[in-house]
Amino acid sequence: MMESTPALRASSRLIVALDVDSHAAASALVASLSPHVGWFKIGSVLFTREGPPVCALVKDSGARLFLDLKYHDIPNTVAGAVRNALALGADMITLHASGGPTMLRAARDAANEAGRGDVILVAVTVLTHLDEKEMNAVFGAKERVEDRVLALARVAREGGMTGVVASALELPAIKRAMGNDFVVVTPGIRLPDAKQDDQARVVTPEQAIKAGADYIVVGRPIIAAKDPAAAARGIVARMQ
């Protein structure tokens, strides 16, 4: 069972997004940052180009691997994808909550059958680049972002997920509705006065931790810094 959030060291709650497009760039970042952070996230850009070897790079560093490929397909296909992700050493995996509880349950069952019931399976709710207007256009509804996030969080729990990926702006409502044991991974983290880039719903590290985030995902504020290791240490300090 995962440690409760208060017991987790701040560095173990910081996930650095390897938002680069080559093994060489990822290798340099992992070498610089692995003494200071507990996790690295590999997304679709890096994985599509470099594949399994970049996962091995993270695992060989001693860090934990968040494979963020956001599976969304028929249950049998998703189950197979999860089995393959686990074979690569994934410690955390994303799936889209909108795939529904049957798809999500297939993922959980695949993990259990592989002897990896400990893997953190998190369902994506509403992507953090969407504001309310765009979200409603996508879903064909008229509702608040928070309401949609909560509905998808309930789908995630029904499907056996460990938790969800959600903005810290909706995080307190998720914790109230789902309980503190329901893990929330929060992307869209920016430092004060930084550009939002392509994110619409962003918060600082302090705001995310105060709101109850179990993990925060940070990309550009670390990997684009002049000194990524110093930037990571600074964010860890802000989380404490």
Residue ranges and their predicted role:
Residues 8-12, 73, 77-162, 167-170, ...:
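Conserved anion-binding
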Residues 52, 65, 167-217:
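A C-terminal functional module that forms or caps the active site or interfaces directly
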Residues 104-110, 114, 209, 222-240:
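C-terminal helical cap(s) of enzyme catalytic domains, especially alpha/beta-barrels
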Residues 88-101, 190-192, 198-231:
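Glycine-rich phosphate-binding active-site loops on the catalytic face of alpha/beta enzymes
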Residues 16, 40, 70, 93, ...:
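Conserved, mostly hydrophobic/aromatic
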